[in-house]
Amino acid sequence: MKIEVTPTENINAEITLPGDKSISHRALIIGSLAEGETKIHNFLSSEDTLSTLNILNSIGASIKQISEDEVIVEGKGKDNFIEPSNVLNAKNSGTTMRLMMGVLSAQNFYSVITGDDSLRERPMKRVIDPLSKMGGRFFARKNGEFAPITILGTKDISPLVYKTPVASAQVKSAILLAALYAKGETQVIEPAKSRDHTERMLKYFGADIAQKDTTVVIRGLTKNLEGREFFVPGDLSSASFFIVAALITKNSTLLIKNVGINPTRTGILSVLKMMGADIKIINEKTLNNEPVGDLLVKSSSLKGVEIKGEMIPLIIDEIPILAIAATQAKGKTTIKDAKELRYKETDRIRAITRELKKLGIDILEKEDGFDIIGNQKIRGNCTCESYNDHRIAMSLAIAGLIADNPIEIDNFECVNISFPEFTEIFEKIRSI
């Protein structure tokens, strides 16, 4: 599907976003591990989260979607999964594959998990290595690196003390989910703090888990987790597209309600504020052990910054839209230490560089990031490629709002992977 984006003068709107993708995945998995009913409100029904739902049902979970954003999980406890009769397909979802590898490694049965063309080229050895040390057996392509992956699980999961080579919430979460089955204490130590949704949710459901700085300590379950009512806050990664839209269009004010403001996710807000963004968090509260608030965003004059090191894991998903903000910032913006972007749904460093050059932006590609010279006009009258990457597609749509002429974006349907309602909300903010 090809779409055309035409420029807009300003944005003045109030919006509410669908549920957070990371949290929706985890609520399905942890609810299935628990005993009793878990009712999930504001669930994100996207291609990625439905991959998780379908895989869980394939191994014996009982999950019913009773409306677009409401799901009921009839939890049977951690020891009641069954061997699947077919290959499990995570499609495009790396979160599904990596977190489910943690669960499957601790089951006393055989399973095979695969994905689409893109996911089968994403690195999995970083998850296989620690789970193998815990007792799971894995067989994968290219010397244990790529899916399809055969898993011979075991009920004799061993506790582990593990230092992750990179900060990765998915690697950490896979270990923590397997550790629920271990007898004793498992520690995960990261070089920098990554998203902590899994830790917060496990604690909310009754696990014995503690965090200190970049170390997480969890004890294996002596009784099942308990099903809970759960509200999924709005997705801050999804909000970031509209935040940047309001910042870079003139005379704009945008209110985004009930957004998750977990400190391990607000890196994008910190970076944008460093750039001079007028963003305020109001009406703060805590729901299900997750901080939530409303975001008030106003047009701002931005300046270039350098982003590197420990900040990168906290904004890794938002770098494509941050690049759009950088095109309108005064001076140079540098992104470095972000080589992980090359192993996402597409090589995002290359994709961002190629598409921004089409739009007339002065950008220099580097091995681990890029430099953007800002304060530039975005040139329209061209067709951009999404590379079937949802975050690239949505970032280009935001760029189109301030282009001097309309732009077209190919394969825009890929936004359904994470944000099926994007086009509807995008049109809403333009029309008010």
Swiss-Prot record:
3-phosphoshikimate binds at K21, S22, R26, S168, Q170, D317, K344. Its EC number is 2.5.1.19. It is found in: Cytoplasm. Phosphoenolpyruvate binds at K21, G94, R122, Q170, R348, R391. The active site is at D317. Keywords: Amino-acid biosynthesis, Aromatic amino acid biosynthesis, Cytoplasm, Transferase. It catalyses: 3-phosphoshikimate + phosphoenolpyruvate = 5-O-(1-carboxyvinyl)-3-phosphoshikimate + phosphate. GO terms for biological process: amino acid biosynthetic process; aromatic amino acid family biosynthetic process; chorismate biosynthetic process. It comes from the Bacteria. GO terms for cellular component: cytoplasm. One of its GO terms (molecular function) is 3-phosphoshikimate 1-carboxyvinyltransferase activity. Pathway: Metabolic intermediate biosynthesis; chorismate biosynthesis; chorismate from D-erythrose 4-phosphate and phosphoenolpyruvate: step 6/7. It is an enzyme of class 2 (transferase). The keyword Transferase applies. NCBIfam families: aroA. Monomer. Catalyzes the transfer of the enolpyruvyl moiety of phosphoenolpyruvate (PEP) to the 5-hydroxyl of shikimate-3-phosphate (S3P) to produce enolpyruvyl shikimate-3-phosphate and inorganic phosphate. Belongs to the EPSP synthase family. This is 3-phosphoshikimate 1-carboxyvinyltransferase. It comes from Petrotoga mobilis (strain DSM 10674 / SJ95).
